[in-house]
Amino acid sequence: MSITFNKKQQQVINELNQNILLSAGAGTGKTNVLSYRVANILNKNRANADEILCLTFTNKACRELKNRITSQLDFETANKITIRTIHGFAYQVITTTAKKAQTIFKEFVIFDDEDQKTLIRQTIANFPKARALDIQYIVNCIEQLKQERALKHIYTEDIEADYTTIYHQHLKFNKTFNQQQNDNLTKFFQFDGLNIIINYELALQQMHGLDYKDLIANAYRLFQDENICSSWRKRYKCIMIDEMQDTSSFEYTMLEKLFPANNIMLCGDEFQTIYEWRGSNPQKILTAFTKKYNPLIINFNENYRSTKLLLETPAS
């Protein structure tokens, strides 16, 4: 069955020179368009299959995109394209690099969200004050501290010393700018937060575990090595990242290391973020991307799913 695309959809499929910023909600045909764009990149010889990187935030979106792309191509070609979630890609970066470097964690266990919460509950059992805190609040604070550690490059073999350094920096900042009233970490530290993060990290280390924030943080750390980063940047000529509305600023910072000299397309629905609590700030990311990479901005405003639902609704 042939598919008819509207003008804006055709523009996304055919524009292979400029970077693109696509705003497209559910039902606008975005995933189909992305799969046809990948096929067009290959047909026009703009990149080989193994030089295309497609990333999503959720597993569901990743599976759907992979299925659509596979339906456009033969299996062997489709299988060469890197189609991952952002965390899956970070995992790939870590494990691939670990094979080449003796200093990097070679074998580790991934702690998903539920594993993480279980370990946190076990950790706070030793700190009575912390039991009054909501578990998701503790998760958020731990992830914020991990992110600060990565961004500030505070990495030694002494976990306790590293987080104590961050703690004292935080106290100094609050004292200087009088920020403690509105700061989540201040409250966390008042409820034994420093001991919680240290003991949580030590427990993870003992079990050779990495949580999802660790995947991003360690990929970010690896990309600080220009040789490693350049190697990954040269792998891909075309990069498409979907679900940007749910991508955190830290994840974007890690991925942006791959952008220079490549063709980049970001897509998402900036009005439908459901992960704001984990650092998702679509407008901040879109503004930064627009300013630095001067993309063609396209908005899919025709919702085919809504039209179909209206047509299928029986008359009253």
Task: Give the positions of each predicted feature.
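Conserved RecA-like helicase ATPase core segment
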Residues: 249-316
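P-loop NTPase Walker
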Residues: 1-103, 230, 312-315
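Accessory N-terminal region flanking or inserted into the helicase ATPase core
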Residues: 1-23, 28, 32-33, 51-53, ...
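Helical mechanochemical/support elements of P-loop NTPase systems and associated helical scaffolds
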Residues: 61, 65, 116, 134, ...
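Short, polar/flexible loop-turn hinges at active-site or ligand-entry regions and domain interfaces
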Residues: 46-51, 72-81, 97-112, 122-135, ...
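N-terminal helical cap/lid subdomain that shapes the substrate entry/recognition surface
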Residues: 88-89, 142, 295-296
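Short, well-ordered alpha-helices that flank and scaffold nucleotide-derived cofactor binding pockets
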Residues: 36-44, 67, 71, 217, ...
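Conserved helicase core region in the C-terminal RecA-like lobe
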Residues: 84-92, 239-243, 267
